[in-house]
Swiss-Prot record:
Span of domain GP-PDE: 344-654
Keyword Hydrolase applies: yes
Gene name as annotated: gpcp-1
Identification of the protein by name: Putative glycerophosphocholine phosphodiesterase GPCPD1 homolog 1
Biased composition (Low complexity): 676-690
Nucleotide-binding keyword on record: no
Disulfide topology: none
Organism: Caenorhabditis elegans
Lineage: Eukaryota, Metazoa, Ecdysozoa, Nematoda, Chromadorea
Amino acid sequence: MDQDYKAHFKVFCSEVREWEKIHVVGSLPVLGEWNPRKSFPLTKSTDEENTFHAIVSVPSSIKEFNFRYIRVMYLDPSENNTSEPIMVLSKWETFNNARTCLIGVESQDGVARKNITDQFGSYSGKTQITDGWILNEKESVVYFRIHGEALKFFAKSYANKEYRLKVEPFDVRYSEMFSYTRKDITDRRGVWRHSSVYASMSIDGDDVVNLPTPSLPCFSNTDLSVLTREDPIFGDQYFNGSVFRNDQDYLVFRTRTVSLQNLAFRIEFYHGEKRCALSYVLPSSMSGTHGATVSPVIGLSSAPVGHINVNYMIVKRNKYTDQNLDIDSMKTTFGRYWRKRNRMLQIGHRGMGSSYTKNIGQRENTIFSLNEAARRGADYVEMDVQLTKDLKTVVYHDFHVLVAVAGRDSPSSTPTAAGENKSLHEIAIKDLTLAQLNLLHFEHISRANGSSAESPVALSVTPSKTETDELHVPFPSLAQVLRHVDENVGLNIEIKYPMYMQDGSHECQGYFEQNKFVDIILAEVAEHAGNRRIIFSCFEPDICTMITKKQHKYPVSFLVVGATNRYMPFQDIRSDCSKIAANFAAGCELLGVNFHSEELLIDQKPIEIAEKYGLIKFVWGDDLNSKEVQKHFRDEMNVDGLIFDRIGEDEVLKQNVFVVENHNRSSLFARSQHNSRSPSMSRRCMSTVE
């Protein structure tokens, strides 16, 4: 009987933190079969800094296997003294093709990879490391944003000074504070230390909690991204925090936790290197998963000297993940993958274009329009997805429609013919069930501004009696689109989530909770997408962040309006300023940005920022209806794709880039087969079967 192979793993990781461990995950059962929760832990080397190693047995029947290295940390929810530490994924290798070991070829005397030291995140000439997504039901990622007029001081001695802010998480159950700060670390691990804050708050100590501290905290370190500086990448905080100036800076703090109900934050104010004030955000201050809170700022005399406004967002695990185990598989990831091509991609806006406000013959966001764009050579088609009252996905752009309602004839009026006494009333898509959307008669919301329903310029939302098949349904579900749109065309799924506008109005009040909303859409994609090429996009930056923290298979691009005179801008500066949008996309590790053509034709600086961080550059906007403008973006700005109406009209029908590439690969393979030595008869038979 053949003996098992011995496979050696040794990896150097220069940026591993003191509290992190390195695991290996891969195609072998001993490596977890791509499940990170079943990955194999490596041992830290005692004589080589930041180096980890392990040896595993591989059955002799295995000739090849694949693997990746991951960085993890353990957090303890400390619930009823019975909970076990939970593994949290910090970073992982995300090159498209995982590492390969041809163990049958590489092994000598049954031992493979004995003298190989891998570099974490680097393989085959590529370097790519990405933040981990949420793996556990109890795990959450908390984002704190401090920006705008966040600080207000009513004590004169504190006003008109420049402050540095630092955010430290703590567990409200313990008087000690766990420190990840390097100067507090002994034996290369985080430590619990008695907080000087608690010591100063009580004379006799009666109000101090003295529960025994667990060996591990329930929270991670807090890292920082500054969107208004040149380097927006998340990283460790300085010991005395980062400069914050009202109406100038935008600070984003990020922490993971496995005990959200016990997590609080201490905001430390520094003037130079001296701490001069504190503020606290307690669990009770965060009543939902998305909102804002105002906390008092306490000075050195323990008296309030001002207050600070903080926005927060809490991202939770996709509750449908356990129904589709492939979501957590590390075998393949496209979250940061993009193949650069010489040809700029053409993306059909809502299929063939905006039909309810422009003179376009195909009803927008229908299966027919999406397929027509694909038939005319679109590489991707863009479509809009939102939810109905009964939590069903629906492909439709606007948050509201006009519903035709038949009124009663008044007693004094002359009876009217059936259907004549109708009026249009505005109603939100979220307040209608999918069945109602497919039953009632609707007009586009633009008709509320006086546009005639008989106008030849735009189509009615409700199709005519001759358009009764599924292809022309104005409210198809996302599943219908995934099943019936040409599989050769990529899908740019724009997720519609309402936002506040600069004039104080809101696109659609009382909308769905963000985690619930995103989970439903991601679950439908996971169930029906198959091997489709998919890119998500959204104007709401927090939705973009959520998607990256709930899955890693599909990439995300941030939609931005930027500086504009055509539309009412959003309140959120991340969507209002393309430079900050590019920084946001880089910091959150998105694939790229969908820039608005209006701003880029005036200022190309956002393109330069995107290129600096390797972001993919898409462009949308009415300017792109001009062939000359399209040529300008292609030749002068070297963008990766354009999103526009009427794709392929007035042109000879062509195939999209993916069809052409597949055809070229097939032709190349056929030629290589033809030029190779003739196979044996048995081989010919096998080839015929395959």
